């Protein structure tokens, strides 16, 4: 016969296991969702996060300069392969870096459909 203390411990252990499993499943689904978003925008972001941050900085600066709602999103659209990004390069006075930025955008967007 099981003692009352052993029964309570077993119940607590089962609840703890259920919470841990749910947390693991939730975390896994969040990571998969984040990976899909990243892969949809910039297929080669994984392994090139430093390039992404350098290019993204242009969009952040542009949004800060003009305080325009959605400017950063427009700039990042299609993994920075758009006219808004080029406009932001000029607006942030980074035209001298345009060739390097275009190369980074090409690396980040390689494999993009």
From Swiss-Prot:
Disulphide connectivity of cysteines: 42-79, 59-75, 62-88
Similarity comment: family membership: Belongs to the arthropod CHH/MIH/GIH/VIH hormone family.
GO molecular function per UniProt: neuropeptide hormone activity
InterPro entries (UniProt xref): Crust_neurhormone_CS (IPR018251), Crust_neurohorm (IPR031098), Crust_neurohorm_sf (IPR035957), Hyperglycemic (IPR001166), Hyperglycemic2 (IPR001262)
GO BP annotation list: circadian rhythm; neuropeptide signaling pathway
Name the record gives this protein: Molt-inhibiting hormone
GO CC annotation terms, alphabetical: extracellular region
Protein function: Inhibits Y-organs where molting hormone (ecdysteroid) is secreted. A molting cycle is initiated when MIH secretion diminishes or stops.
PANTHER family associated with the record: ION TRANSPORT PEPTIDE, ISOFORM C
Signal peptide: 1-35
Cell compartments where the protein resides: Secreted
Key words of the record: Disulfide bond, Hormone, Neuropeptide, Secreted, Signal
UniProt keyword DNA damage, yes or no: no
Matching Gene3D superfamilies: Crustacean CHH/MIH/GIH neurohormone
Main location: secreted
One protein family per Pfam: Crust_neurohorm
